Design a protein with these regions (language model features):
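Noncatalytic partner-interaction/assembly domains of nucleic-acid and motor enzyme complexes
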Residues: 1-105
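Non-catalytic interaction/clamp surfaces of large macromolecular machines
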Residues: 112, 120-132
Length: 132
């Protein structure tokens, strides 16, 4: 499944099932989303949650406006999630979506590390033991 689809499904699930955030908040951080806009929405959602507020579309949108008005305007708010709200039928899958996002994030981190190590290997005089 495409990363953006999973990320949108998770965000929609969090709005539909307020209990899911309890399981997801310890697993994901905003920077783990491949789409920075999704991470921005998640950050606004979790910031509200951490202040003991029940996040909904209106509160999250207001939080986004406060956090970064320019970014909020550039991305057009969270209106594009409204389509996803109609397609996400099983909000109980939020934890599975979060685990998949986490898995993709770990793979991206590993890829970045391997590219860095490959670059080190190609430099003259590199000690192979230090690279490993």
């Amino acid at each position: 499944m495409e990363k953006n689809v999973i990320e949108r499904a998770l965000l929609c699930s969090l709005f539909l099932d307020q209990v899911a955030i309890l399981e997801v908040v310890g697993l994901l951080r905003p920077e783990m989303f491949s789409d920075p806009d999704h991470g921005f929405i998640y950050e606004a959602f979790t910031d509200l949650f951490n202040r003991n507020k029940r996040p909904d579309l209106i509160l999250v949108e207001e939080e986004m406006k406060k956090k970064d008005p320019e970014r909020y305007l550039k991305m057009g708010g969270i209106a594009y999630l409204s389509d996803g709200m109609e397609t996400v039928r099983l909000e109980h899958n939020a934890v599975e979506y979060a685990r998949e996002i986490f898995r993709h994030y770990l793979l991206a981190c590993m890829h970045k590390l391997f590219v860095q190590k490959a670059s080190e290997c190609l430099q003259y005089g590199t000690d192979c033991h230090k690279v490993i």
